[in-house]
Amino acid sequence: GIVESSSNDKFKEGDNVLVTGYDVGVTHTGGFSEYAQVPGEWIVPIPQEMSIKESMVYGTAGFTAALSIFELEKYGMNIKSQPEILVSGATGGVGSVAIQILHKIGYENITAIVRKEKQIEIAKKLGAKQVIIIEDDNKPLKKGIFDYFLDTVGSNVTLYGLKRLNYQGVATVCGNVAGNSLNANILPFILRGIKLIGIDSVYVDHNIREDIWSKLANEWNIGNSLLYNEIGFEEFYKTIDQLLKGQHLGRTILKV
């Protein structure tokens, strides 16, 4: 939004700013109101290259997707080597943005996980080279296929990817829509030396926040191709219900 008034010297009236994470929507209510009062340390200036609306089309999900890619690159993922990358929840809020960013910055070997056949073509249009619908299996270890795994849904999907990582593969996990439990075994870790990294977008360092938003406004900018729809309050609860049932597609912004 736009700063109306501020007692913090870092911000002044008229500044374009955003807030994601911290206690917003948890203990600090008012996320859907026209006015909000928040601590200054929660606030991130919106980069000049990005509009207010665009920042919210990205939202927490877009920020989390970018943060996941940031972490994977920190652990060795790079365009030059063109690694095999697996992305789950490919048509959801986080997964769809992740695939588009990866495709935009030059990664070619992206495999997307979807739940339904009708999502296959959508995932391909987003930038996935291959699309799979996974099936459960009981084997503790499978043939290594992927170098990196960006998981957005958790539980059995996390397990599916971990078992298929190549030697010293790296996985990130940022969501739990498929469940909180992880019935994993240690074989992928001790036989292939894989890493599993948790992504927390709530309390991540403020300097990293600003770096991520700068990337989203510049070299990682996919604002013109983001999959989103805009709704009013009358559609709010229906949209939340679709999200909880795994029927939601892309991003949704609420017009207030």
Segments the model singles out, each with a brief description of its role:
Residues 1-24:
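Glycine-rich beta-strand-centered segment in the early N-terminal region that forms part
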Residues 87, 103-156, 214:
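Adenosine-nucleotide cofactor-binding segment
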Residues 207-256:
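C-terminal hydrophobic helical "lid"/dimerization subdomain
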Residues 101-109, 167-168, 192:
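Conserved S-adenosyl-L-methionine
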Residues 156-222:
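Glycine-rich phosphate-binding loop and adjacent beta-alpha segment
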Residues 62-63, 89-96, 100, 154-155:
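Glycine-rich NAD(P) Rossmann-fold beta1-alpha1 loop
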Residues 18, 147-150, 172:
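N-terminal Rossmann-like NAD(P) cofactor-binding module of classical short-chain dehydrogenase/reductase
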Residues 20-85:
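NAD(P)H dinucleotide-binding glycine-rich loop of Rossmann-like/cofactor-binding domains
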